[in-house]
Structure formats: structure tokens, C-alpha cells
Amino acid sequence: MADKLTQLKALTTVVADTGDIEAIKRYQPIDATTNPSLVLKASEIPEYAALIEDAISWAKSQSQDKAQQIIDAGDKLAVNIGLEVLKIVPGRISTEVDARLSFDTEASIAKARKLIRLYNEAGIANDRILIKLASTWEGIRAAEVLEKEGIQCNLTLLFSFAQARACAEAGAFLISPFVGRILDWYKAKHNRDYTPSEDPGVVSVTAIYDYYKQHDYPTVVMGASFRNTGEILELAGCDRLTIGLPLLEELSKTEGAVVRKLNYTGERKAKPTPMSEAEFRWELNQDAMAHEKLGEGIRMFAVDQGKLETMLASRL
């Protein structure tokens, strides 16, 4: 019998949640995703030293202002890592907009255009790139504009049905609903464990997947942020799943049947009237878990972006 990773790939597009080239070569995913935390981690890999030096050299050529050089170097490093990943994966790389721009639509759009320009200048077409944006109201509005320009987006830090609905209504190419971080919140709140099938994160993604299929939204559902392989296997059949290295390794070394769990066959319904900003904010506010986890996720990515910039500043 084939290992579970091989079987899962027959049901779901498997994406590697890493910027580690050697690991990507090992597990052969279709796509790869990065975020500020993963870029920071990748920057510590000795083989990537040349990518950092190139980013710094480029930043110095763009501006005489030290603060701007730091920002430019961070953007170029994220793209440099993405370029290396694209030499390996046949599909797409997701590169994230600075989390500190999560509540600024215009700044998010400008940053996305800059990242796309850097990829384009390196010979990479838009259809191999996804721009990651936080699923705030402002991030979703930025995605709506970018999608119309041919810049496809990955809406991340998604913890609630309201966020998922708003993303679909905005025409986002893909969403990354988080599974493990939802589980973390419920375990801490209720002081109990959950089986994979009753895992609140799994239940959330399943509901979003079914809703999208029911209403014929083309937005891709890519489950993310897993804590164990049980969560992953309960979502077999999801459009895509982005998986970190430890769980990719565990799946590749485990045998046993993998069964499709997501496969909507119910009735189709007409799309509802799009949510207003007031409706979105109210529903997000009423979901304590999503409200807390969205804010926490943005803060965590901002901290790692700051650490990355501190490292780059020390080399400028």
C-alpha cells in the first residue's frame, strides 16, 4: 500500500508550507506557501546567504534612505526565496504582504503590486504567484481590486465563516482557513481534547468548503495551520491543503487507507446578496475565537517581520 502522503495527493492538491528548498525537493508538492515567519526561518539557512546579500545590494541601489532600504531588502528577500522555490514546484508560490498593512487597503495594494513587479522583472508570470493578504475587511477589499488587475490572491489568517463568505464575494482566487489555531483556542477555552472529526477547525473548513460548492463560488479552499495528521486526513478531498514539514514527513512514513472526506453532492443555491462592511465587522466581533485569533496572527507575523528587518538592518 502506498504511504498516506501519496494517497492524499490523489485526492487533494498538496502544498508545502515552507521556504526550505531541500524539503520541497523531498516532498514534491505542487505549490508552496511562505509567510513572514517562514521567510525569517529560511533566512537562517546557510545556503540562502547569497539571497540575503542580493536583496541588500538591490535595496541599496534603490534608495539612499536607510529605512526604505530595510523595507526594500525585506521585499526582495521574500521574492528571492520565492524564485528559488519556483525552480522546484510546478505550480505557484504564495508571498505575503507585510502584516502591518493589514488595515490599510491602499498600502496593501501598493505592496502587492511591488511584489508582483519584482517577480515579473525576474521573468515570472502572474499565474505562478499568489499574493497573501490577511482576511481583514481592508485586506479583502485590496484583493478585490488586485483580482481585477490579474493579480491573484491568497486570503490568509481566516478563522470564521464571515471572513470566508466575504472573500468569496470579493472574487478572491484562494482562501487559507486555519485549522490548528482554531483547535488551540477551543482546547484552551474548554480544557478538553477533540477527535479529528469533531475538531472545531476541521468542522469550520468543512462548512466553508460545502458553502462554496453549494453556491458555486470558484474560490479555492486551501486548509492550513495543522496540528496533527488527523486534521489533514479529515479534510482529504479539500481543494488544496498546505502542510508543514513535520506533518509531511509523518504522512510520507505512514501507511493506511486515505478516504475522501470532502465531496459536496447536495443541492445548489443562488448566491446571497454580498455582505456589507457593518455585517462583516459585527459577525467577526461576535465570533470571539476568530476575533482573537485574527488579531493574534497579525501581531505574530508583524513581530517576525520586525525581526527580519532587524537582521537586514544589521547588514546594511
UniProtKB/Swiss-Prot annotation:
Annotated gene: tal
Q: Under which EC number(s) is this enzyme classified?
A: 2.2.1.2
- What's the protein called, per UniProt? Transaldolase
The record's function comment reads: Transaldolase is important for the balance of metabolites in the pentose-phosphate pathway.
Gene3D superfamilies hit by this protein: Aldolase class I
What are the protein's GO molecular function terms? transaldolase activity
- Extract the signal peptide range: none
Give the catalytic activity: D-sedoheptulose 7-phosphate + D-glyceraldehyde 3-phosphate = D-erythrose 4-phosphate + beta-D-fructose 6-phosphate
GO cellular component terms attached to this protein's record: cytosol
Return the Pfam families for the record: TAL_FSA
The entry describes its oligomerization and partners as:
Homodimer.
Name the PANTHER family for this protein: TRANSALDOLASE
* Pathway the protein contributes to: Carbohydrate degradation; pentose phosphate pathway; D-glyceraldehyde 3-phosphate and beta-D-fructose 6-phosphate from D-ribose 5-phosphate and D-xylulose 5-phosphate (non-oxidative stage): step 2/3
Major place of residence: cytoplasm
GO BP annotations, alphabetical order: carbohydrate metabolic process; pentose-phosphate shunt
